[in-house]
């Protein structure tokens, strides 16, 4: 919006597509994946007074986590019980105004959002992918934006990085010449983010070379030849 506002200030012309601008208030918003990142997305969405917050995950959120979201919504928005788990992905996207992707990339999620799954989404819904680009089929997303099936697609991740010049996500748009909110994977370039990365690497190296091996659980991905976390596709 900062870029758009600057363009408006220079041109003085109000673009026609602004007539299709909506708030998140009273909308049904969902997340694919409700782990550490997905849950934080839900926390932030409460402030926009959504009608429902849906999530799709192989396991339920702890009751305490759900209660925290519902209580915040009731306190600030006057309505509780907005959080709901949906067991079938097709059912969730069919009722969502906005779908956000917050799950890891693994064999079961690669190409998950293809033409078939997108066909189950509401006409004019928005799809936001800040997880991994390859979770979506690039050509299918571009076609959905062009046809108007999706009102828009946004993300900071690409299925190929750096994206080739002819990548469909570079130029896709709809009849109003909008619907494309792609950025070039720069969400982690803030000074604060870089400091966190550096500190995390330092902690891991110090733990290893001191032979303490007291790693934080979230820093361990593989242990004893298998995944140490259930975030990469394994359900047991």
Curated annotation (Swiss-Prot):
NAD(+) binds at residues 36-37, 57, 104-108, 130, 156, 185-188. Keywords: NAD, Oxidoreductase. Pfam families: 2-Hacid_dh_C. The record marks 132, 185 as: Important for catalytic activity. GO terms for molecular function: NAD binding; oxidoreductase activity. Belongs to the D-isomer specific 2-hydroxyacid dehydrogenase family. FDH subfamily. PANTHER family: FORMATE DEHYDROGENASE 1. This is Truncated formate dehydrogenase 2. It comes from Saccharomyces cerevisiae (strain ATCC 204508 / S288c). The gene is FDH2.
